[in-house]
Each structure stands twice: as C-alpha cells, then as structure tokens.
C-alpha cells in the first residue's frame, strides 16, 4: 500500500506511468508474483497457501531495472532512424490511414480461454480504477459477453457453420461466439486496410474450445 500511494504522489506523469507499469507487472503474473495467488495472468486466480509471496520492493526494483535497460536501447534505434511510438487505439477501428503499415504481428484474444479483464483488475484496482469503470471497459472488449451484436460484417461460411452448434447446448454462448467472430472479422478487415500491398501480417492463434467444440 505504501508503495502504490507513493507512486500516486509523483508529479512527473512520465515517471509515474513507468512506476505504475512496474507495479502492475509484479502483480499480474502466472506464478512469480508478490501475492499468494497463482495464474493471475491467465484470468484463473486461485490462492495457494504454500506459496511464499516475493518481496514487493525487490521485485519492483528488478522490474524497473529491466525497463530502464529497454528504454536505454531506444537511443540505438534513434541513431539508426528507427523509433517505436506506442499508439492507443481499437483494433476494430485503427487510427491509421490506408496502406501505411509494413508488418503486423499480433495474437488476437481467444473466444473462450482467458477472461482478460479478470486478469487485469488485480493491478487496475490497486491503481485506483473503480469496479464500475472496469465493468464499462470490459463491455468494450472484443467478444465481450454483455452486449449483443447488432449487424456486423458477413461472416465466412466456416464461421457460420460453427456458430449454430453451441446453440443447442447454450444459446448465450452461441451469441457470444457470433459477436467474437464478428469483431475479429472487423479487426482483420482493418489489418487489410492499413497494410501495404505485398507486406505481411502474422497472427498467432491457438486452439480454443467452447462446450467441448473446437471453435
């Protein structure tokens, strides 16, 4: 608590964000975190009484040193005329012009594997995000369960054949799956729009099952 309160008092917004990133990264981990929980990163948290939480200050210092090393390497890229610039946006409506991207490397969210907001909330609540705000954000995630799809792009036949199958078992899950496919289609359409002709898009996708069905 002392650490996060101290970070919140830092006036320099850039420094504060780096420290918030550091703090978040030592909470949401698979196993080597500073709490008694396991598998926070995969959204399946459970307490393990035999686990000894790691020292918060030591872990923060270790992570911060890693980040400072990464940031120092930006000078190498700058000297070569190459700089990374993070841009916040929505994959379904990219804030980019047509034909401006040379390479896309991404791993889309899974249809039924990880509850991303459930994983994120353990650090976001510490960083003073309210549960109401988290709920609003969750509703905007790709494939979110709260909002039904209205319209959306026409799906490939293979996707349409997959969707009715879960309906007999769970109509709610079928609607969630339709929304997921619809929004992934929007994302892929945006990738096609911004990618230059002849350039590559690499999508890493693993197996996902819903009610025992491969989707």
Positions of PLM-derived features:
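SAM-dependent nucleic-acid methyltransferase catalytic core
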Residues: 2-105, 111-117
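A generic secondary-structure signal
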Residues: 6, 190-191
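Short glycine-centered segments of the SAM/dcSAM-binding site in methyltransferase folds
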Residues: 18, 199-200
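SAM-dependent methyltransferase catalytic-core segment centered on the flexible catalytic loop
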Residues: 110-190
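Acceptor-substrate binding/catalytic loop of class I
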Residues: 173-182, 204-215
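Helix-to-beta-strand junctions that scaffold the AdoMet/dcAdoMet cofactor pocket
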Residues: 194-197
